[in-house]
Amino acid sequence: MKRYDKYDELYLLEAIQDAGLKNVQVIASDEIRQKMIDKFVDFSLNKSDERIFLNFKEPTNVYYKNSYCLQVLKNNPQKGKFYLFAEESKSCLVLNNWGEVLEILENLPYMNVYILDELLSYVISVTEEDNMIFTGIELNEKFRNYKE
């Protein structure tokens, strides 16, 4: 079995392809990436403490319903971390690297996942199965520099 560098995004993408995960879509086009960001999320920088604030758009959008997710991310977003939320149980799983993300994807095959690369490494994972909603987000320095 091939081994993948858990901290290298390119190795994660290769591992996903090798695993043949049908529920994972890798979005590499700048145009598509921006459309996804525009569709789902409003970003604003708080200049006083450099936190990134995330506001999910449209009350009908599934992401907007995850108020616990918003609360955690607004209060304590950590650069380079991935967040997975279970809405019903109000639990938050913080993942440290791409390897951990891949492990979650392999064990939750019913989730629909979108991975955006480069400027904003951004993972959206959502399912309504069993009344649970998962959302994962990574914040990174490239995004801060890109938006300012």
Q: Where is each model-derived feature located?
A:
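Structured alpha/beta or helical-core interaction and ligand-binding surfaces enriched in interleaved
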Residues: 1-131, 137-148
